[in-house]
Structure formats: C-alpha cells, structure tokens
C-alpha cells in the first residue's frame, strides 16, 4: 500500500535511512543528536506536515553507517514515541507498489493466516505487522491498495488470538491515519470484499498481493 510520500523514498545503497514515528515537536538538531554517533551525516530531510506524524530521511556519507544506525535506533524509545528506522524501500511499477523488502528471502511461511480489511490508505506492511504482532510472532505480512492485508503467524494459537482479540480494533498508520479493521480467516469472504469485475472464481482467498511479500525472521528483532 503506497503512502503520500512513497515517491520520495529511494534505495538502500546511497546511505539514506527513513526515520518514522517521530514526536510532533522534533527538530533537525534532535535528529542529528540521535544519529551523529553512527557516522558523518550528509543531509537531514525532516518532513513535518500539519496533522500528520513527522518523519525524516537521514543520509550518511558511508552506507555502512546507515546500517549501523538502523540496527541501533530501530525500535528506540524516544520520548513517548518508539522510532521506526529502516532503509527506504524502492517503489516502482504502476500503482507504486514496493519492490524488494530488505529482509531478504523467505525465512518461513505458515498456514496460520488471517486476512485484514479496512486498512487506511497510508497503512503499510510494517504498520500491519506492528499492529498484528500483539497477538504473537508474525512471520509474513503484506498489504494491497484496496485496504486489504494478509498476516501469517508462527503458531496456531497466535492466529486464533488475533481472530478473537484484534478484530474490530483501532489501527493507526505511521502517518497518523486511523481506522477500525476487521480480521478474519483466509477462506472467509466476509466483511464485503467484492469479487473482481472479471467475475473470476475458484480462488481460495479474496486476497491477491500485487507487491513483493515481506518476511520476518523470528530470530531477529524488529
């Protein structure tokens, strides 16, 4: 699912990182203080748009310093906010779908799968993973542009907990958009998902991803 700033994001070889979930009063100097110890900073771009959660791009002279910054600051508690720090993913193709998650090849897939509907326009796979891992370890997450998402859990009991406890819960994207989402089993077509205009049948799931899937190793912190 693309966001309002998807066209500003680049690849990971230029030393640039994305910093999200920043406090509303953040300044460029604050970002410099957060990241200077990882290496020489070439540029800081702070995006503080009215009514949205601020985010920024920080560019290091050495791409290896960018990797260190991600390792050291992703998930870091900064004031009342937990930072999200990652490489900007390259967007391309019609519709702006992401290509090439940094997490590498599939580490594990699971049959313990749920579908999610009602995601806000700026909701990303990372937002979905963060929300749904309240039920347990997520090994796969993906989204598409019509507000649908798919999540796979490592354990059946976590999937069952998500179906019971995360259905009709308030979801918040990295840009501050909120909505109440529905969570249901993959083979269900509940909650108004409409079939394509072609009238095609025979699919086990109403979900069809148009972008690269995103895998998560249960042995790495996110």
UniProtKB/Swiss-Prot annotation:
- Bias-annotated ranges (Low complexity): 190-199
- Keyword match Ubl conjugation: yes
Taxonomically, which superkingdom? Eukaryota
Question: Which cellular compartments is it found in?
Answer: Nucleus
Which Gene Ontology BP annotations are present?
mRNA processing; negative regulation of mRNA splicing, via spliceosome; RNA splicing
User: What molecular functions are annotated in GO for this chain?
Assistant: protein domain specific binding; RNA binding
Region annotation (Disordered) maps to 190-222
Q: Which cysteines are joined by disulfide bonds?
A: none
Q: Which residues carry this modification: Phosphotyrosine?
A: 193, 215
| GO cellular component: a single term | nucleolus
Record-listed Phosphoserine modification sites = 190, 194, 196, 205, 209, 212, 217
Q: List the SUPFAM superfamilies hit by this protein, alphabetically.
A: RNA-binding domain, RBD
A Pfam entry, by short name = RRM_1
* Residue ranges of the region described as Interaction with SAFB1: 189-201
Per the database record, which ranges form the RRM domain? 15-90, 112-188
Q: What does this protein do?
A: Plays a role in constitutive splicing and can modulate the selection of alternative splice sites. Represses the splicing of MAPT/Tau exon 10.
Q: Which family does it belong to?
A: Belongs to the splicing factor SR family.
Q: What is this protein called?
A: Serine/arginine-rich splicing factor 9
């Amino acid at each position: 699912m693309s966001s309002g700033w998807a066209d500003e994001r680049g690849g990971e070889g230029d030393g640039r990182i994305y910093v999200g979930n920043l406090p509303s009063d953040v300044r460029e100097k604050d970002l410099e203080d957060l990241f200077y110890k990882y290496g020489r900073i070439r540029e800081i771009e702070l995006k503080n748009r009215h009514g949205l959660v601020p985010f920024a791009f920080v560019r290091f002279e050495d791409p290896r310093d960018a990797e260190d910054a991600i390792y050291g600051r992703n998930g870091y508690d900064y004031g009342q906010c937990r930072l999200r720090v990652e490489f900007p993913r390259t967007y391309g193709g019609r519709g702006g779908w992401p290509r090439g998650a940094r997490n590498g090849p599939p580490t594990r897939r699971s049959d313990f799968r749920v579908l999610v509907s009602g995601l806000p326009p700026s909701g990303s796979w990372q937002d979905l993973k963060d929300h749904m891992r309240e039920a347990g370890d997520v090994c796969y997450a993906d989204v598409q542009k019509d507000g649908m998402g798919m999540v796979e859990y490592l354990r059946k009991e976590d999937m069952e907990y998500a179906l019971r406890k995360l259905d009709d819960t308030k979801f918040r994207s990295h840009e501050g958009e909120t909505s109440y989402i529905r969570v249901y089993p993959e083979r269900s077509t509940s909650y108004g998902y409409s079939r394509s205009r072609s009238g095609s049948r025979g699919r086990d799931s109403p979900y069809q991803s148009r972008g690269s899937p995103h895998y998560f190793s249960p042995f790495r912190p996110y």
